[in-house]
């Protein structure tokens, strides 16, 4: 499968697996809630309040069970706002649960969806919550990069640019925005340069919770059409970027390290989509690109730095060979046609010539037809070639 098709299929599979059936979650006591405490830490101790399998609410999970764990306080960020939920492990004195994704449930509950990989755990147990540091760190890099990207797009393209959607996970970022045409290579390069400049400036990323009125006074951007409560969280990267955002971010833009746009395309009328990479994703992208160039250079029997010149020379050689081939085909066609002066016939005052040639394609038949038209003057020309299939041309002189 094409990488983009495979990636889309994987995302569909991910989206289809959201833990237990919704009716199972409806059975949970609505008074039970969860609190997210993971903006500044990746581990915490908490009490298990709910356990479910994929079919029902249960009191305990045993090794091999797939299900959902709910605790009163968690450092796991749930999927929302375009950010993919955290992965990691939940440990108790008797067992270990691998968290494959974290989801937001009704009533303020946060569900940790995954598999019981060791022992067992029960409702009421004290659990140690551990988010995967690498997973969170890479997701944060991509999320913070989308904020820099939006501001860079508005700087290069204009203030009409507004976010229409986004998705971030540890591997890449996707950003949808309003714009009336495809971006030029120069515009994409300018946006990349701006983002990488802000990364190099090592700008501290500051978050603050304030009233929505206070947030608007700071110039922070809100997502169009989004509903906000009385208080909002504002993520600021110096004076360059300020946005309403509840997601997790790097502490400093320098943590993003690198930024690279890998695609820009339209997804709807007036909406464009950028896919991009950061840090290790960029390094991997260039490593794969370098490998491709080396393979191409090997096939072309040239050094990588000479590949462009080699390809240009090969193209010139191909054009020359094609031209020579056309000349040879014309000569062969003329030879196949032979001397036709004696083949010209006349019926009721109309001259005509009918002949057969072998090994001639349709293009050469037309050329031969033009040649014979010149010889016959006013009349009809019919040429037939049979090389597995019948090809013919019939040309009447212009006067007829």
Which residues are covered by each model-predicted region?
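Terminal appendage regions of diverse proteins
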Residues: 1, 17-18, 160, 253-394
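Non-catalytic interaction/regulatory segments
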Residues: 14-45, 170-267
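Conserved phosphate/anionic-ligand binding catalytic regions in large, soluble enzymes, centered on
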Residues: 74-87, 141-154, 240-258, 267-269
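Divalent metal-coordination and catalytic microenvironments
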Residues: 81, 147, 175, 234, ...
């Amino acid at each position: 499968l094409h990488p983009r098709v495979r990636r889309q299929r994987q995302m569909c599979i991910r989206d289809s697996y959201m833990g237990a059936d919704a009716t199972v979650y409806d059975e949970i006591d609505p008074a039970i809630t969860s609190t997210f405490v993971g903006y500044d830490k990746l581990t915490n101790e908490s009490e298990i309040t709910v356990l479910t399998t994929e079919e029902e609410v249960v009191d305990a999970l045993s090794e091999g069970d797939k299900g959902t764990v709910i605790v009163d306080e968690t450092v796991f960020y749930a999927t929302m706002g375009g950010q993919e939920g955290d992965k990691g492990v939940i440990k108790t004195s008797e067992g270990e649960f691998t968290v494959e994704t974290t989801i937001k449930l009704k009533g303020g509950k946060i569900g940790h969806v995954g598999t019981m990989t060791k022992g067992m755990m029960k409702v009421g147990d004290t659990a140690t919550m551990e988010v995967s540091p690498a997973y969170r760190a890479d997701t944060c890099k991509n999320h913070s990069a989308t904020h820099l990207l939006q501001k860079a797009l508005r700087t290069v393209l204009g203030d009409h640019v507004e976010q229409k959607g986004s998705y971030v996970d540890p591997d890449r970022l996707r950003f949808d925005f309003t714009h009336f045409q495809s971006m030029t290579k120069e515009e994409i390069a300018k946006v990349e340069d701006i983002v990488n400049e802000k990364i190099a400036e090592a700008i501290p990323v500051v978050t603050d919770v304030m009233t929505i009125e206070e947030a608007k006074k700071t110039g922070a951007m809100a997502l169009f059409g989004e509903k906000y409560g009385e208080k909002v969280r504002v993520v600021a990267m110096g004076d360059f970027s300020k946005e309403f955002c509840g997601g997790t971010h790097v502490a400093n833009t320098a943590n993003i390290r690198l930024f690279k746009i890998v695609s820009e395309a339209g997804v709807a009328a007036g909406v464009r989509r950028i896919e991009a990479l950061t840090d290790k994703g960029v390094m991997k992208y260039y490593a794969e690109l370098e490998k491709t160039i080396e393979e191409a250079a090997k096939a072309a029997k040239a050094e990588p730095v000479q590949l462009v010149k080699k390809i240009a020379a090969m193209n010139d050689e191909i054009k020359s060979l094609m031209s020579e081939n056309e000349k040879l085909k014309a000569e062969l066609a003329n030879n196949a046609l032979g001397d036709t002066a004696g083949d010209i016939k006349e019926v009721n005052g109309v001259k005509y010539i009918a002949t057969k040639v072998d090994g001639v394609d349709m293009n050469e038949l037309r050329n031969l037809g033009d040649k014979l038209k010149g010889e016959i003057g006013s009349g009809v020309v019919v040429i037939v070639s049979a090389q597995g299939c019948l090809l013919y041309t019939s040309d009447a002189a212009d006067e007829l």
